[in-house]
Amino acid sequence: MKSLVLCACVLVLAFQSSSSSEIKDRLKSAVRSNLQKYAEPCFSENNATGDDRYTEEDIMTNLYAKPENAERTRKNGCVIACVMKKQDLMEGTNIKEAQVHVRINEVLMNDGPVQAEAHRIMRKCMKKVRSITQECEKSFSLHVCIVEAMDKLGQHNEHELDSDTEDEAVTEQAE
């Protein structure tokens, strides 16, 4: 459920941050701990098991897009939709966008930088999936968008570190 629950919207983020990598790690940890009570019943309701779950790597390598994984992908999307509905963040096929942002504000009220990043990611991802009319597909597409955005956060921090290391090497060579 780990990365699957990540979808449940970057909404239940309870942490502070200073770097992109730290934001990513804290997001994942907070989401896992805060959504577990919703996830298990939703897996059960959708006849899904731990074997149906996709890892972050599975998503980043597009494993879900292979034809033989269509049913697994559908189940994942339906579990995500169920979790969102239990949190009153989705009704029918519509994501309650205003409620998502209210939830982010409630959970991250004392963490401006992380709150701003969560709002940015959610605005982008909700806009991207807005026209999808099937709830399981919409929910899974939202999940994919969030995972990709989180991966970019981590990559951004790695590039900053690479850049700092290169700057140090240039400085050392100049001396």
PLM features: residue spans?
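Mature soluble extracellular domains of secreted precursor proteins
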Residues: 19-175
